[in-house]
Amino acid sequence: MANNIYRVPTIYSDIKKTTEPLSVRVPGSKSITNRSLLLAMLAEGKSTLRGVLFSDDSRHFLKCVQDLGFETTVDEESCIVTVEGLGGKLPCEETTLNVGSAGTAARFLTATLGVSEGVFHMDSSEQMKRRPMDPLLSSLAELGCEVRCEGEDGHFPFTLTAHGSGQDHISIDIGHSSQFLSALLIASTLSSEDFTIQVEGTHGMAYIEMTQKMMEQFGVCVERPTPDQFRIPAGQHYKALDYQIEPDVSAACYFYAMVPLLGIPVCVEHVHFESLQGDVEFLRILEKMGCTAQDTEKGVLLLPPSALSDAGTQTPAFHGITVDMSSCSDQAITLAAIAPFADSPTCITGIGHIRFQESDRIHAICTELTRMGIRCEETQDSITIYPGTPKPCTVATYDDHRMAMGFALTGLRTEGIVIDDPGCCRKTFENYFEVLDQVIAEISEV
């Protein structure tokens, strides 16, 4: 990387001829790391978290836990953090927190503090100030929390004056983010009554299931009387754990996407289909496009399509697909980045909510593909991408880590792709481009 750009090496014609799969190790899951930090904070006693991801998002979350007064120890080299929980109590009743650009910190901590007791001044990065908070803040106001927004209503920064939970039920619209529901679920144990959450919207349920399973691992049972209702019986408390965090499947997917793109087998260590993470569904999508998956002791091994296209023996034939990616929407960019090389159009649906993430991802994808000369079409909640050969292009990343990491894949197969501001990947995968360079050196003869 130089001058804050990354020139992607085009290695497609230089792939080593080998039957040995590429073996990759990725850092811990951001989603699980940040959930486990909050659950450990709310538990009674000392939790030891292993395999912790250290990135911009998780560091902001950890700093917030520390700024609230919780005792922690941090060993970045060993990826271990300990948190001394106080059984739902907070060490301080007034403080200022900055969540950075971390959506999980923004939503999860806001919900927990909003049903606690105290005065909490909440700030964020400029990027996070553009992302919606209103559904969660409105729900907290219904529960008795005083919310004072200091800028645009429903956005950071704001001050919470919390008096505990004033009622035993709430409704939440998750049309913009499933994190609103996850946040309220985790915080619900602070209520002295049975707590019921009525949900409007259906997207992101894979993340909700992750939250529910992790709550159960930490000792709290969540009931689901109907598909759109959650009930948390009173009297439950989180227990401190020695907890192993899974590798980040979202990060693993960039390397699995190389399988159809470059025609190489890939195994990401310790990634298995029984993962808590919804992005494991992306591997099933790649199977439908022609790949074959084997869940081995080491991790899922993904094999490239065996058939070859009419374009020549170099090109693995993988198929376009129409797919609802609402359960693994973080991989919409990944699929879009390799879709031009498929043998038929790809239509990604169920992703309207990604317009409200680090960037308007639907618009960003279509803008950058169009600049590469690739035909694509967008609706409010879908993208259709047609086969073609991408032209040289400097890809704008919109301060969005997934745009940077995803579109680097495109350049592995076509000349002239440059990633602008690759450092934005520090949000979730600080050394992504270093790992990518190592992979390139291993699989190519350049």
Residue ranges of predicted features:
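Short, structured segments at the rim of ligand-binding sites
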Residues: M1-V446
